[in-house]
Amino acid sequence: MKRSGYCGDIRESSIGKEIAVCGWVHSRRDHGGVIFIDLRDREGILQIVFQPENKEIFEAAEKLRSEYVIAVKGWVRNRPFGTLNTNMSTGNVELVAVELKILNTSPGLPFEISDYIDTSEELRLKYRYLDLRRPNLQKNFVMRHKISKEIRNFLNEEGFLEIETPFLTKSTPEGARDFLVPSRLHHGNFFALPQSPQLFKQILMSAGFDKYYQIVRCFRDEDLRADRQPEFTQVDVEMSFVDEEDVMVVIERMLARVFKMTLNLDIKMPFERMPYSEAMLRFGSDKPDTRFEVEIKDFSRELKNSGFSVFSSVISKGGIVRGLCIPKGASFSRSEIAGLTKFVGEYGAKGLVWMKITDTGADSNIVKYFKEYEIRVFISKLNAKSGDLIVFLADEEKTVAQGLGALRLKVGRESGLIDKNKFNFLWVVDFPLMEWDKEEQRWQALHHPFTLPKDADSLTKENAGRAKAKAYDVVLNGIELGGGSIRIHKSGIQKKIFNILDISDESAEKKFGFLLKALTYGAPPHGGAALGFDRLCALISGEDSIREVIAFPKTQKAVDPLSNAPAAVSDNHLKELGLQQIEN
């Protein structure tokens, strides 16, 4: 029996036609001596009717159970009056079976094949082949395909070349740990799986390819946070003879195309450009969610001579004081406010100062330490109203920004202030080139060490903390979709950066010598970007977790319950690789 169409594609236009469909038994019902089967395939569900008049296939249909794989031939007809199902795209029609073939059977299921299941993620991933049959996940992967197709179409039309870069490459650990692959032919030596194609795409620009792209798998052996994967996919782009605006415009147009073709949304361009310092001040984050108007305000200047010693002493030591208004937060109980204090404590804050705004001013056990005009300044700058709660943090700038930034998002989510129908894009620009690592007592590149400084000629180790990078991150609704930079294309500047980062000439040559040499042979000015493809797919599909748009994801412990990877290998295999296992 040859399939002539998909279950989910059958409509009134097929009425009176004989068709054949294949799929999985989604459900079975017996009504008044008639058997009804909901047959499911990739495109949807079609109701199949087995009538007792056709004794042979009726008896066969009685044996059908959930997830049996069958092929059915029959005639399409209108559903009888009163039995239409407006929740299904095929809800006006049904197939009256005249032939049935059972292609495979299935035992009892560990969970129901439904979009609404109450089961552990571990179990879902163990039986991922069943989990992936759920209609919502099927839709997610159809959407993922559409997104990759539109990205490729756009970049191809713009003159980009899709070029693959190596998966077996050299370990250059500057950031997350590499996944290492031992060499069988060269004992004691290892390949590394790439964290990104960064160095190779720069070399492709040096080779004269002008515009490159790749939708590429990347690997990072890092401690997994809430929604990270050890292997992930990114959209990788690089261009020659460009500046920051050139790259950002291409990425904007690509994203606008994707959102139009997938969600039929018209994305406003150009995206807002927001300096890093402004993002950290107003939103406490370098990936600000601008869908709601609650903003952080700085009061360090107004409070440097404050009678409240907690504030004035912090400011005198070089710290800052910033505040946030929580709409209608005056109704919070002391225990709820204590919960907020505990929350910001997770970001290093030592305490949370608060005031409840009333019709007559402010109410708190610390109000007495402030002059009346200071209270008015708080209320005015924070645009606070009666019934609101204003909170303050006093500490070093990074702690205050992170604490209030996280609290702002918590308030936005829990108070229903975020408009989930909005898609607010923006670029964060003017990043610091480097940040000081207190533990290692050295400068670290904020993005990566191949980013071009805004004023490379005047950069020294002494002024590195003030240097700005030609870097840019694209943010959507508080999520960093990706980022990029203009790269260093002269070996002398690259060596200077390595020197400031305390990477010795010997170490730089050992790790990056092939790049440094390529830069000496007439490398053009170039720049690019990389976008998190999994994250983009999750956002467009309306999913909170990227695991819902990755076919075979790992758990938070970096384990695949389906295949039980990672797994031990035999001693013989280790011996071939020149390795041996040692006891912990």
Curated annotation (Swiss-Prot):
InterPro entries in the cross-refs: Aa-tRNA-synt_II (IPR004364), aa-tRNA-synth_II (IPR006195), aa-tRNA-synth_II/BPL/LPL (IPR045864), Asp-tRNA-ligase_1 (IPR004524), Asp-tRNA-ligase_1_N (IPR047089), Asp/Asn-tRNA-synth_IIb (IPR002312), AspRS_core (IPR047090), GAD-like_sf (IPR004115)
Binding site for L-aspartate: E174, R220, H447, R487
UniProt cross-references to PROSITE patterns, sorted A to Z: AA_TRNA_LIGASE_II (PS50862)
Origin: domain of life: Bacteria
Gene Ontology BP terms: aspartyl-tRNA aminoacylation
Annotated site residues (Important for tRNA non-discrimination) in this chain: H31, G82
Native species: Endomicrobium trichonymphae
Span of the signal peptide: none
Renumbered residue ranges of the record's region Aspartate: 198-201
First-tier enzyme category under EC: ligase
Family: Belongs to the class-II aminoacyl-tRNA synthetase family. Type 1 subfamily.
Biological role stated in the UniProt entry: Aspartyl-tRNA synthetase with relaxed tRNA specificity since it is able to aspartylate not only its cognate tRNA(Asp) but also tRNA(Asn). Reaction proceeds in two steps: L-aspartate is first activated by ATP to form Asp-AMP and then transferred to the acceptor end of tRNA(Asp/Asn).
First-listed, main subcellular location of the protein, grouped into a coarse class: cytoplasm
Protein name (database record): Aspartate--tRNA(Asp/Asn) ligase
Oligomer status and interactors: Homodimer.
